[in-house]
Amino acid sequence: MNLQHHFLIAMPALQDPIFRRSVVYICEHNQDGAMGIIVNKPLENLQIEGILEKLKITPEPRDSSIRLDKAVMLGGPLAEDRGFILHTPPSRFASSIRISDNTVITTSRDVLETLGTQQQPSDVLVALGYASWDKGQLEQELLDNAWLTAPADLNILFKTPIAERWREAAKLIGIDILTMPGVAGHA
């Protein structure tokens, strides 16, 4: 089972403050573990334009039709001072890894320098921090009914309003998560 380019959808019973009602986009999953970005937990009072200001990046030439007031996500509890940018191709940046045909993760400054310009990738999600699972840990959490999984959907990843992503991700597999009981059992 490889969950790269899938969503982890927190079950209603998952009460961890960071992962409660979260949707995690899995960027890498192999025999050594998994790494992902939470895509529905906006950081308070932090937008893309604020990140650019802090890093002293001025988009030039600025394209005023591109919004920089999008929220920055809490990507996870690890390395919360590091930026991770999920975006659609191209992957021409210094530190990019292609996750799927339509999704790339970049950690280098050069992608930030394109934000607000015509060179910006068409879809962008900026996060600080990431989530990680050791070898076998994610598989055990799945067995423990902590998560549902669904193939990733770019509309949910980039376009669905943040507050609706948890419910919409569950709908991908035919589940209305708001009607699920708080605790699932084993059959």
UniProtKB/Swiss-Prot annotation:
Which InterPro entries did the record assign? AlgH-like
Pfam families in the cross-refs: DUF179
Domain of life of the organism in this record? Bacteria
Q: Name one cellular component (GO) term.
A: cytosol
> What Gene3D superfamilies does the record point to?
VC0467-like, VC0467-like domains
Tell me which family the UniProt entry assigns to this protein. Belongs to the UPF0301 (AlgH) family.
Q: What is this protein called?
A: UPF0301 protein YqgE
| UniProt organism field | Salmonella agona (strain SL483)
UniProt lists the gene as: yqgE
